[in-house]
Amino acid sequence: MSDYKSTLNLPETGFPMRGDLAKREPGMLARWTDDDLYGIIRAAKKGKKTFILHDGPPYANGSIHIGHSVNKILKDIIIKSKGLSGYDSPYVPGWDCHGLPIELKVEQEYGKPGEKFTAAEFRAKCREYAATQVDGQRKDFIRLGVLGDWSHPYLTMDFKTEANIIRALGKIIGNGHLHKGAKPVHWCVDCRSALAEAEVEYYDKTSPSIDVAFQAVDQDALKTKFGVSNVNGPISLVIWTTTPWTLPANRAISIAPDFDYALVQIDGQAVILAKDLVESVMQRIGVSDYTILGTVKGAELELLRFTHPFMDFDVPAILGDHVTLDAGTGAVHTAPGHGPDDYVIGQKYGLETANPVGPDGTYLPGTYPTLDGVNVFKANDIVIALLQEKGALLHVEKMQHSYPCCWRHKTPIIFRATPQWFVSMDQKGLRAQSLKEIKGVQWIPDWGQARIESMVANRPDWCISRQRTWGVPMSLFVHKDTEELHPRTLELMEEVAKRVEVDGIQAWWDLDAKEILGDEADQYVKVPDTLDVWFDSGSTHSSVVDVRPEFAGHAADMYLEGSDQHRGWFMSSLMISTAMKGKAPYRQVLTHGFTVDGQGRKMSKSIGNTVSPQDVMNKLGADILRLWVASTDYTGEMAVSDEILKRAADSYRRIRNTARFLLANLNGFDPAKDMVKPEEMVVLDRWAVGCAKAAQEDILKAYEAYDFHEVVQRLMRFCSVEMGSFYLDIIKDRQYTAKADSVARRSCQTALYHIAEALVRWMAPILSFTADEVWGYLPGEREKYVFTGEWYEGLFGLADSEAMNDAFWDELLKVRGEVNKVIEQARADKNVGGSLEAAVTLYAEPELAAKLTALGDELRFVLLTSGATVADYNDAPADAQQSEVLKGLKVALSKAEGEKCPRCWHYTQDVGKVAEHAEICGRCVSNVAGDGEKRKFA
């Protein structure tokens, strides 16, 4: 028997079947670095329209976690897809390098500044520590396959950036947005510093809940207001609070102007409460026998005075919109030094912003004899005992509630009035302008807009000063007596900025005021405060984007971070940009959800459900991690687990196998010589290229909409359904058995070439390593890297006017599916082995029959059977299978007649009819020794 194997065009490629990504990717990265791939891309894109995604700086502390990976991969997918869409899209990664977490790390190792080290040495240690953290994180980010200017990132501790942060503050001062005041700020007694809103987390805490009576100073005036004369005992207004320790700072009682307030007689005294809360308060304080003597509107009680239960003064009743009927008594204890609402209403009524608490959380001397020097969280019991002793305590109980805590220490924080510097939301219209700017930004997902609008509408002034060592100095001089800013503040700040640009922030602390103030130096003091780190990162649109040459003066098109950044970086950037320039710093803002485990639980080391990106890359490879990120809907929580990553690896294999099939069957194809013109191609091949064209339209739309899970789904559908289970199956016969240089085979290779050229580019933003690998095996002249080019433009499709148009092949796909069902059943019944052992008869109604008949003898190649005939639907025998999908189709199957050809494996009746080739069929004889078979349709 002759060996006909050598006459077949068997697939062959050096592109490996197994990805082995964990082993192969580092080598590719080394090549990208050695070649300066990022530089090559920049050179290739020079002069094109720009798209600037500005990197929100991660904090330079600790190893990267899965959330970091999600963030950087999403950014990289966008940058690469924009590059392929014809944009010059530089990517400059950044790091946030100042602030408390770094100070704490350095403190742990070396002690606090001023103990063993000077503050200057401490700052140097902080700078050193941040630099090592940046290096560690940078290696991991690069390993993810993220392309960027990694050798020239921006760091908020770069001298030039530090100087530009000072300049940003100068611009805000020049525009009139800065003011100084004693205001209640979030204060951590462990950090001994004010905290930004974004540094506050909420945890459940058990606190005492108390009802306290403030006796009226003028009892008769109250009787008159309520229209009563007979009251048994003193009259009091009752407040409710869960922070007894703040009572020494009480300066008023807030009530709502429009609520009804009742005067309620209880045993031996009368109390004033919101009428709607009388029943719940009576239940709480254990009183069943009470009488409502009268009611008035809250507005009637304004400015009546009540005696503080244990301090030696009385306080007014004032009107506030923040009073609710959700809980309590309808009368709110008001301490302007310990709460933002209290502060706002206190300003309105000219109340003292009293703050009897020191930075360490203990009462200052002279507060109250039994409280001086006591920690406020230990003072609740003392205050409650005092109230009891004075007969002012109506009720006490424990309650659990959500309480603000320091993100770093996880300990409860307090509101504490301290002298601080603020960016005012309203003194120069910053709030109104910011709300206007928000409307001009595209928020993705769109609920982000309402979220940030409500945050901006309700946020207090931004406290930008911190009492820290490692941070950008505010660089201000204030008058010793008046505490007013120096009249030449902007000029002086520029002078400081120039010095910082040369020597870093230490230049401020080394600066002798005389050097720039001359004779005035004795009248002014240097402000020792540093800037909130959110000011550092929030000003990068100015300190980085405006000055980096690769951005060429363009503003950022996009900011992309986790959804917690509405109150963090998106907010601080919006505030600073609007205060400086009157406009938002971004055109689009995209947010992604947090990572959770397979069961939807938050990642936590204590539960042991964290997924380390380093482990994933070392086991499965970065491309699997990238595919998981892209295939997950980032608008909600992003679930990740070993099982989910395994599914991503399965999807990856399907894509890789498709790419490998294309490459293996392009063996021996030279596009410069072997390409077949579209009009001369086999119809099915043109259909396949048309499928790629339709897929490309969908994929490009999805990339444009940042809808990456749609990109992956469409890519998978193309690989698995349109190619894998239809086209690639059908062409194997023609590809392997036709004459090597025949139009039938070259037509097929032409289609595969166009498809491969498109596919490798669709993959590139997501499966960057694999796309680079595929690119290296594609035939024909090309640039060195897929990333420097643009989407493939060589695709074409069938015209709708053609008889065998897309709709024709869509119907054929359905017919093929129905035939497969019948073959599967016959295989299960052991009537046939493979599909080539079968012959089918398709009983079809006239319209479908005409389409099937048009394919002639080539119908069998589409159905992967050795025989296929078409007959009238009404002639179908009883055992023919009715299609559920196509009502006008029945399928009957029989065993194929004739012998099996050892070369093409088809069963035919002309095997051995040609003496010189006695073992093979006539078609194979033609392909081996004759002119080769002609194919028109399939």
From Swiss-Prot:
It catalyses: tRNA(Ile) + L-isoleucine + ATP = L-isoleucyl-tRNA(Ile) + AMP + diphosphate. Keywords: Acetylation, Aminoacyl-tRNA synthetase, ATP-binding, Cytoplasm, Ligase, Metal-binding, Nucleotide-binding, Protein biosynthesis, Zinc. Zn(2+) binds at residues 901, 904, 921, 924. ATP binds at residue 605. L-isoleucyl-5'-AMP binds at residue 561. It is found in: Cytoplasm. InterPro entries: aa-tRNA-synth_I_CS (IPR001412), aa-tRNA-synth_Ia (IPR002300), Anticodon_Ile_BEm (IPR033708), Ile-tRNA-ligase (IPR002301), Ile-tRNA-ligase_type1 (IPR023585), Ile-tRNA_ligase (IPR050081), M/V/L/I-tRNA-synth_anticd-bd (IPR013155), Rossmann-like_a/b/a_fold (IPR014729). Its EC number is 6.1.1.5. SUPFAM superfamilies: Anticodon-binding domain of a subclass of class I aminoacyl-tRNA synthetases, Nucleotidylyl transferase, ValRS/IleRS/LeuRS editing domain. GO terms for molecular function: aminoacyl-tRNA deacylase activity; ATP binding; isoleucine-tRNA ligase activity; tRNA binding; zinc ion binding. Binds 1 zinc ion per subunit. The modification N6-acetyllysine is found at residue 183. A motif ('KMSKS' region) lies at residues 602-606. One of its GO terms (cellular component) is cytosol. Its cofactor is Zn(2+). A motif ('HIGH' region) lies at residues 58-68. It is an enzyme of class 6 (ligase). Belongs to the class-I aminoacyl-tRNA synthetase family. IleS type 1 subfamily. PANTHER family: ISOLEUCINE--TRNA LIGASE, MITOCHONDRIAL, SOLEUCYL-TRNA SYNTHETASE. Monomer. IleRS has two distinct active sites: one for aminoacylation and one for editing. The misactivated valine is translocated from the active site to the editing site, which sterically excludes the correctly activated isoleucine. The single editing site contains two valyl binding pockets, one specific for each substrate (Val-AMP or Val-tRNA(Ile)). This is Isoleucine--tRNA ligase. It comes from Escherichia coli O6:K15:H31 (strain 536 / UPEC).
